[in-house]
Amino acid sequence: MIDGPAGREHRDHGRYDAYARHHDEHGSTELIPAATVIVLRDTPDGLETLMLHKNSKIAFGGMGVFPGGRIDDADEVLDENGRPDELATAAAAAVREAAEEASVTVDPDEMVWFARWIPPPVMPRRFATFFFAARLEGDAGSVAIDDGEITDHEWMRPADATDRRDAGEIELAPPTWMTLNQLARYTDVAGALADMEAAEPAFYETHMARTDNGPVAMWEGDGGYETNDPTMPGARHRLTMVEDRYRFEDDRS
Protein backbone atom coordinates (compact mmCIF):
# COMPACT_ATOMS: atom_id res chain seq x y z
CA MET A 1 0.00 0.00 0.00
CA ILE A 2 1.39 3.41 -0.97
CA ASP A 3 1.39 5.72 2.03
CA GLY A 4 0.03 9.23 1.66
CA PRO A 5 1.82 12.50 2.30
CA ALA A 6 1.88 14.25 5.64
CA GLY A 7 0.74 17.84 6.03
CA ARG A 8 -1.70 17.91 3.13
CA GLU A 9 -3.10 21.40 3.72
CA HIS A 10 -2.22 23.80 0.88
CA ARG A 11 0.49 21.46 -0.39
CA ASP A 12 -0.09 22.44 -4.04
CA HIS A 13 0.13 26.17 -3.27
CA GLY A 14 3.27 25.62 -1.23
CA ARG A 15 4.96 23.51 -3.87
CA TYR A 16 4.20 26.04 -6.62
CA ASP A 17 5.49 28.94 -4.50
CA ALA A 18 8.73 27.05 -3.82
CA TYR A 19 9.15 26.40 -7.54
CA ALA A 20 8.52 30.09 -8.30
CA ARG A 21 11.13 31.22 -5.77
CA HIS A 22 13.68 28.83 -7.25
CA HIS A 23 12.92 30.14 -10.74
CA ASP A 24 13.27 33.76 -9.59
CA GLU A 25 16.67 32.99 -8.07
CA HIS A 26 18.12 30.64 -10.67
CA GLY A 27 16.11 31.06 -13.89
CA SER A 28 14.93 28.22 -16.12
CA THR A 29 16.82 24.95 -16.17
CA GLU A 30 17.67 22.91 -19.25
CA LEU A 31 15.36 20.13 -20.36
CA ILE A 32 16.39 16.59 -19.42
CA PRO A 33 15.32 13.89 -21.93
CA ALA A 34 13.23 11.22 -20.20
CA ALA A 35 10.76 8.42 -20.87
CA THR A 36 8.05 6.62 -18.92
CA VAL A 37 5.83 3.62 -19.57
CA ILE A 38 2.33 3.14 -18.22
CA VAL A 39 2.12 -0.59 -17.52
CA LEU A 40 -1.44 -1.90 -17.78
CA ARG A 41 -3.18 -5.14 -16.89
CA ASP A 42 -6.72 -6.53 -17.05
CA THR A 43 -8.43 -7.70 -13.86
CA PRO A 44 -11.98 -8.83 -12.99
CA ASP A 45 -12.51 -5.31 -11.60
CA GLY A 46 -11.30 -3.63 -14.78
CA LEU A 47 -8.13 -2.04 -16.12
CA GLU A 48 -5.34 -1.39 -13.62
CA THR A 49 -2.06 0.47 -13.92
CA LEU A 50 1.17 -0.02 -12.01
CA MET A 51 1.93 2.89 -9.69
CA LEU A 52 5.28 3.33 -7.98
CA HIS A 53 6.09 5.41 -4.91
CA LYS A 54 9.15 7.64 -5.28
CA ASN A 55 11.74 7.91 -2.54
CA SER A 56 11.06 11.20 -0.74
CA LYS A 57 14.74 12.23 -1.01
CA ILE A 58 14.92 12.43 -4.83
CA ALA A 59 13.27 14.45 -7.63
CA PHE A 60 9.47 14.15 -7.43
CA GLY A 61 10.01 12.40 -4.11
CA GLY A 62 6.99 10.99 -2.32
CA MET A 63 4.80 11.05 -5.41
CA GLY A 64 2.94 8.25 -7.14
CA VAL A 65 4.58 7.77 -10.54
CA PHE A 66 4.79 5.41 -13.49
CA PRO A 67 8.04 3.53 -14.19
CA GLY A 68 10.45 5.86 -15.96
CA GLY A 69 13.39 8.20 -15.77
CA ARG A 70 16.04 10.06 -17.69
CA ILE A 71 17.33 8.76 -21.02
CA ASP A 72 20.94 7.55 -20.72
CA ASP A 73 23.62 7.51 -23.41
CA ALA A 74 23.50 3.70 -23.35
CA ASP A 75 19.83 3.79 -24.45
CA GLU A 76 20.70 5.31 -27.84
CA VAL A 77 19.22 3.53 -30.86
CA LEU A 78 20.37 4.33 -34.40
CA ASP A 79 18.13 4.31 -37.44
CA GLU A 80 18.92 2.51 -40.70
CA ASN A 81 21.08 5.44 -41.77
CA GLY A 82 23.14 5.40 -38.60
CA ARG A 83 21.52 8.50 -37.13
CA PRO A 84 20.10 8.68 -33.59
CA ASP A 85 16.43 7.63 -33.51
CA GLU A 86 14.90 9.79 -30.77
CA LEU A 87 11.65 7.83 -30.40
CA ALA A 88 13.29 4.39 -30.41
CA THR A 89 15.86 5.65 -27.91
CA ALA A 90 13.09 6.89 -25.61
CA ALA A 91 11.32 3.53 -25.90
CA ALA A 92 14.54 1.72 -24.98
CA ALA A 93 14.91 3.94 -21.92
CA ALA A 94 11.33 3.26 -20.83
CA VAL A 95 11.87 -0.50 -21.12
CA ARG A 96 15.10 -0.27 -19.12
CA GLU A 97 13.56 1.87 -16.39
CA ALA A 98 10.60 -0.52 -15.98
CA ALA A 99 13.03 -3.39 -15.51
CA GLU A 100 15.32 -1.48 -13.13
CA GLU A 101 12.66 0.11 -10.96
CA ALA A 102 10.11 -2.69 -10.77
CA SER A 103 11.53 -5.82 -12.49
CA VAL A 104 8.72 -5.45 -15.03
CA THR A 105 9.07 -6.67 -18.61
CA VAL A 106 7.37 -4.81 -21.44
CA ASP A 107 7.72 -5.51 -25.15
CA PRO A 108 9.13 -2.42 -26.91
CA ASP A 109 7.45 -3.49 -30.15
CA GLU A 110 4.06 -3.47 -28.41
CA MET A 111 4.46 -0.13 -26.64
CA VAL A 112 2.31 2.77 -27.82
CA TRP A 113 3.69 6.30 -27.75
CA PHE A 114 0.75 8.54 -26.87
CA ALA A 115 2.12 11.79 -25.40
CA ARG A 116 5.11 14.00 -24.75
CA TRP A 117 5.25 16.36 -21.80
CA ILE A 118 7.38 19.51 -21.44
CA PRO A 119 7.36 21.01 -17.92
CA PRO A 120 6.89 24.75 -17.33
CA PRO A 121 9.95 27.01 -16.93
CA VAL A 122 9.15 27.44 -13.23
CA MET A 123 10.06 23.82 -12.45
CA PRO A 124 13.49 23.39 -10.81
CA ARG A 125 14.11 20.13 -12.72
CA ARG A 126 12.54 19.80 -16.14
CA PHE A 127 12.14 16.33 -17.63
CA ALA A 128 10.97 16.38 -21.26
CA THR A 129 9.23 13.03 -21.17
CA PHE A 130 7.95 10.61 -23.78
CA PHE A 131 4.89 8.74 -22.46
CA PHE A 132 4.35 5.16 -23.64
CA ALA A 133 1.72 2.59 -22.67
CA ALA A 134 2.05 -1.18 -22.72
CA ARG A 135 0.41 -4.34 -21.48
CA LEU A 136 2.17 -6.17 -18.67
CA GLU A 137 4.18 -9.12 -19.97
CA GLY A 138 4.14 -12.11 -17.63
CA ASP A 139 2.96 -12.46 -14.04
CA ALA A 140 1.95 -9.35 -12.11
CA GLY A 141 3.32 -11.05 -9.01
CA SER A 142 6.81 -10.67 -10.44
CA VAL A 143 6.89 -6.92 -9.72
CA ALA A 144 9.82 -6.17 -7.41
CA ILE A 145 10.80 -2.62 -6.56
CA ASP A 146 14.44 -1.51 -6.44
CA ASP A 147 14.05 -0.11 -2.88
CA GLY A 148 16.27 2.78 -3.88
CA GLU A 149 14.53 5.34 -6.07
CA ILE A 150 11.30 3.39 -5.55
CA THR A 151 10.04 2.45 -2.09
CA ASP A 152 6.67 0.79 -2.83
CA HIS A 153 4.29 -0.21 -5.62
CA GLU A 154 0.61 -0.84 -6.09
CA TRP A 155 -1.77 -1.81 -8.90
CA MET A 156 -4.61 0.70 -9.09
CA ARG A 157 -7.63 1.39 -11.20
CA PRO A 158 -7.06 4.86 -12.69
CA ALA A 159 -10.17 6.40 -11.13
CA ASP A 160 -9.22 5.01 -7.73
CA ALA A 161 -5.80 6.64 -8.01
CA THR A 162 -7.23 10.09 -8.76
CA ASP A 163 -9.83 9.68 -5.99
CA ARG A 164 -7.07 8.86 -3.54
CA ARG A 165 -5.19 11.98 -4.58
CA ASP A 166 -8.27 14.03 -3.80
CA ALA A 167 -8.53 12.30 -0.41
CA GLY A 168 -4.92 13.20 0.38
CA GLU A 169 -3.68 9.60 0.36
CA ILE A 170 -1.22 9.99 -2.53
CA GLU A 171 0.31 12.81 -4.56
CA LEU A 172 0.27 12.97 -8.36
CA ALA A 173 2.05 15.36 -10.71
CA PRO A 174 -0.16 16.89 -13.44
CA PRO A 175 1.08 14.58 -16.26
CA THR A 176 0.38 11.53 -14.08
CA TRP A 177 -3.07 12.80 -13.12
CA MET A 178 -3.95 13.65 -16.72
CA THR A 179 -2.88 10.20 -17.91
CA LEU A 180 -4.93 8.47 -15.20
CA ASN A 181 -7.92 10.67 -16.03
CA GLN A 182 -7.61 9.62 -19.68
CA LEU A 183 -7.37 5.92 -18.78
CA ALA A 184 -10.33 6.02 -16.38
CA ARG A 185 -12.81 5.77 -19.25
CA TYR A 186 -11.57 2.31 -20.30
CA THR A 187 -12.61 -1.08 -18.98
CA ASP A 188 -9.86 -3.13 -20.61
CA VAL A 189 -6.30 -2.80 -21.84
CA ALA A 190 -7.09 -3.62 -25.46
CA GLY A 191 -9.51 -0.72 -25.77
CA ALA A 192 -7.12 1.77 -24.18
CA LEU A 193 -4.17 0.76 -26.34
CA ALA A 194 -6.27 0.68 -29.52
CA ASP A 195 -7.46 4.26 -29.01
CA MET A 196 -3.96 5.46 -28.16
CA GLU A 197 -2.61 3.77 -31.29
CA ALA A 198 -5.29 5.37 -33.47
CA ALA A 199 -4.77 8.92 -32.17
CA GLU A 200 -1.92 11.32 -32.83
CA PRO A 201 0.39 11.60 -29.82
CA ALA A 202 -0.54 14.59 -27.67
CA PHE A 203 2.04 17.30 -27.01
CA TYR A 204 1.80 19.15 -23.71
CA GLU A 205 4.09 22.13 -23.21
CA THR A 206 2.86 23.30 -19.85
CA HIS A 207 2.42 26.90 -18.74
CA MET A 208 1.66 27.33 -15.05
CA ALA A 209 0.23 30.16 -12.96
CA ARG A 210 -1.06 30.69 -9.45
CA THR A 211 -4.71 31.43 -8.64
CA ASP A 212 -6.67 31.74 -5.41
CA ASN A 213 -8.06 28.24 -6.00
CA GLY A 214 -4.68 26.65 -6.58
CA PRO A 215 -1.99 26.38 -9.25
CA VAL A 216 -3.28 26.13 -12.81
CA ALA A 217 -1.54 24.18 -15.58
CA MET A 218 -2.52 25.45 -19.04
CA TRP A 219 -1.94 23.95 -22.46
CA GLU A 220 -2.20 25.09 -26.05
CA GLY A 221 -5.68 26.27 -26.92
CA ASP A 222 -6.41 27.76 -23.50
CA GLY A 223 -7.32 31.45 -23.54
CA GLY A 224 -4.65 32.24 -20.98
CA TYR A 225 -1.91 30.03 -22.41
CA GLU A 226 0.10 32.54 -24.46
CA THR A 227 0.07 35.29 -21.81
CA ASN A 228 0.31 32.89 -18.86
CA ASP A 229 -2.75 34.66 -17.43
CA PRO A 230 -5.48 32.23 -16.30
CA THR A 231 -8.03 35.06 -16.01
CA MET A 232 -8.02 35.73 -19.76
CA PRO A 233 -11.30 34.95 -21.55
CA GLY A 234 -11.56 32.21 -24.14
CA ALA A 235 -11.46 28.46 -24.37
CA ARG A 236 -10.22 26.37 -21.49
CA HIS A 237 -7.60 23.63 -21.72
CA ARG A 238 -6.28 23.44 -18.18
CA LEU A 239 -5.96 21.61 -14.91
CA THR A 240 -6.76 23.52 -11.72
CA MET A 241 -5.07 21.92 -8.73
CA VAL A 242 -7.60 22.50 -5.96
CA GLU A 243 -6.61 20.96 -2.62
CA ASP A 244 -9.40 18.40 -2.44
CA ARG A 245 -10.14 17.95 -6.14
CA TYR A 246 -8.18 18.45 -9.34
CA ARG A 247 -10.44 19.90 -12.02
CA PHE A 248 -9.69 19.40 -15.73
CA GLU A 249 -11.37 21.61 -18.32
CA ASP A 250 -11.23 21.23 -22.09
CA ASP A 251 -13.92 23.11 -24.00
CA ARG A 252 -11.95 23.71 -27.19
CA SER A 253 -14.14 23.32 -30.24
Task: Please place each PLM-identified region on the residue numbering.
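N-terminal leader/linker segments that precede catalytic domains of diphosphate-processing enzymes
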Residues: 1-150, 156-253
